[in-house]
Amino acid sequence: MSEPNVRASFADNRRPLSKTKGQLLNMPPVITTALYTAFPVIFLLDKVLAFLTWTNDDPYTNFIAIAIYIMVVKYWTVVACTVLPTIIALGTCASLWFLKTTIDDLRSETAPPTIEEIIDTLINMQARFSYIVEPFSYFGSLSGSDYFNLGFSLIAITPCYIWLMTRIFTVRSFLLVFGVAWLSFHSSWSVATRHLLWRSIVIRKILTFTTGLKFSLVDKNIELTVLNDFQISNVGTGKTVEFHILQNQRRWLGVGWSNTLLPFERGPFTTEDLEKSWDSLESFQFPEITQATCRWRWLDANWKTDDSFAPGEGWIYYNNSWEEPSNTDSLTRFTRTKRWKRRALVIVEDDGTT
């Protein structure tokens, strides 16, 4: 009796059909064609950025890449003669196969990409690219003198670099450390390590000496991050905080100036960045500080008009769109703003104090 046929079933690894109706026909033909044609390139760039930022689905790929890099650099003499040609051949074949299968799958007529997929991929790629260039945004805020100090410091300590590379470190060890640091720069544990090292005053002093840039060398006992909107000064054992609140009014026909504003614009009483609002000055509440136990107390009895904001009664007048500020009122001015100020004392207490 013949044995029955044995069949093995494998999971279907093809990209599933989109359950959402394609919206390519709802777009202009030129934009649709451009997005559909460029989608494979966008998808591949998104995969590369995901690998560099450690935001891919399989983080073990990054560890494998780091392990291969360490092996190649550490055993370069052996690898260059024996394993390197095989690694190059296998890597090239794997890359070409991945590119071909990815492009064929994305351009498949049975499951074409939808506008939602293309836009989501573009948004992910933009976010990951912004995450990569975020460490370099610090250099955009430097002045001309900062760039001069940086260049002068790097040139001045160049002999130290040369001495370290020739006497203590080797080129192989430098490539090993630099390559691993670059490949793991955006990993979560690398970011956490840099944040912990940045808390050290010694590290900041070393960076100040080697780069010529000015870094904050003072560690505060408490981070009053919720008070960034207000002016803070140290007084005794506490901190004096000067709160600045903007009063916004609109002129209505037959009513005059009123705190009643349009629903889509700013509130009647807001912070200077317009992020927080209150109905009146009496409804203002102290910010909550979660970093330590604090006790608030007003230093001023009442709110006062900030004379430095505007002369006269302290109002700055705008047009209907809160633009074109002026110190004088006219028939074309329909909105105005006044700044109030009041000082308070926040005392940082220990956990054991009452």
UniProtKB/Swiss-Prot annotation:
Localization (cell): Peroxisome membrane; Endoplasmic reticulum membrane
Organism: Ogataea parapolymorpha (strain ATCC 26012 / BCRC 20466 / JCM 22074 / NRRL Y-7560 / DL-1)
Name the UniProt record assigns to this protein: Peroxisomal membrane protein PEX32
Alphabetized UniProt keyword annotations: Endoplasmic reticulum, Glycoprotein, Membrane, Peroxisome, Transmembrane, Transmembrane helix
Record-annotated membrane-spanning stretches: 24-44, 63-83, 84-104, 151-171, 173-193
Glycan-linked positions: 319
GO BP, one annotated term: peroxisome organization
InterPro entries (UniProt xref): Peroxin/Ferlin, Peroxisomal_PEX28-32, TECPR1-like_DysF
Physiological role: With PEX24, contributes to tethering of peroxisomes to the endoplasmic reticulum for organelle biogenesis, positioning and segregation.
Classification of source organism: Eukaryota, Fungi, Dikarya, Ascomycota, Saccharomycotina
Protein topology in the membrane: Multi-pass membrane protein
Any one annotated GO CC term: endoplasmic reticulum membrane
Null allele phenotype: Results in severe peroxisomal defects, caused by reduced peroxisome-endoplasmic reticulum contact sites. Leads to defects in peroxisomal matrix protein import, membrane growth, as well as organelle proliferation, positioning and segregation.
Pfam families in alphabetical order: Pex24p
Family, as annotated: Belongs to the PEX28-32 family. PEX30/31 subfamily.
